[in-house]
Amino acid sequence: MDASTLTSRLQTATASFRSLERQLADPDVANDPKRLETIARERSRLEPLVLDFEALQKLEQEQADARELLRESRSDAAMQELAQDELSELEAQHTALLQRLTLALLPRDPRDDRSVMLEIRAGAGGDEACIWAGDLARMYERYGQKLGWSVQQLSCTEADLGGYRELIVSVKGTSVFSQLKFEAGVHRVQRVPATESQGRVHTSTATVAVMPEADAVEVELDPKDLEISTARSGGAGGQNVNKVETAVDLLHKPTGIRVFCTQQRSQLQNRERALEILRAKLLERELAAAAERESSHRRSQVGSGDRSEKIRTYNYKDNRTTDHRLGRNFSLEPVLQGQLEDLIGACIAEEQRQKLEALSEETDD
């Protein structure tokens, strides 16, 4: 991004920021909680950008002053050295700030701020794949807890020997999608299963889908398209069996998507959860179709959200996690304990690199 384009975009962002500040002082906005929240969130997003732009302008003035001092002190060797040292320091700060601002101005996914629903499905590998799906669920739960996110199980189908055939988890917090979107795809594990008596290494898989939460306005549901039935929630028998039909079985007839919710205490709560999951699934289908229409270059990017992409292998024998998109290895045990910061950070850096490359190609054209 050239200097004039960067300055123009920063000036536009500053103008938007000032406009948002004026709107926040408007009594009509103060009386509209949803609008107030939207404006306040956008203002908070732009504020660091505006402050960095102001710092950049100040640095550029200081650089100009240092160059002037350098010219005026040609006859004073000691002063020349001081002025040159100051100029070098200012130029280093200027370069770092320019890089940060350039990254901040890259095209932004409007879904990055959202909470998500994680759908984890056992893939190839039978019982071991179900156990592996449970291990992945615990990995994400630990990561979410470290970041102060709320992680709640919405729906699950448990397997006979442990783990899950399918699990849907709600993850609520700040900018959850911006990080977990890199987890969508096929996760492969290579290890000796607990069910293996001969000590042989097996390869199993689980698929992760990352669905940004969708509201009722974004995904409209026609009641005629829904088939809803109820059932008693399952249990271990005796007093643990729910005598009231609280479970909800929801079918979206046009797509064939079925959602079964039993986790909540009341039928109404399970119905609301089922509708939330359905909206998220429908939004994911819509986004996947849009991605399919885009170029193959776009789909090859990290974080494209393709649930069929083989993204990672977890090798227990070598204590190694390999991210195939990055071509990098990470220590296995910390990753399984939810220490995903380095891995996800590397994915974010790669996404930024790809966006910068695309921006450079657009500028060249």
Curated annotation (Swiss-Prot):
InterPro entries: PCRF, Pep_chain_release_fac_I, Pep_chain_release_fac_I_sf, Prokaryotic/Mito_RF, RF-1. Keywords: Cytoplasm, Methylation, Protein biosynthesis. It is found in: Cytoplasm. Residues 306-325 have a biased composition (Basic and acidic residues). Residues 290-325 are annotated as: Disordered. Pfam families: PCRF (PF03462), RF-1 (PF00472). GO terms for cellular component: cytoplasm. The modification N5-methylglutamine is found at residue 239. Its main location: cytoplasm. One of its GO terms (molecular function) is translation release factor activity, codon specific. Methylated by PrmC. Methylation increases the termination efficiency of RF1. Peptide chain release factor 1 directs the termination of translation in response to the peptide chain termination codons UAG and UAA. Belongs to the prokaryotic/mitochondrial release factor family. This is Peptide chain release factor 1.
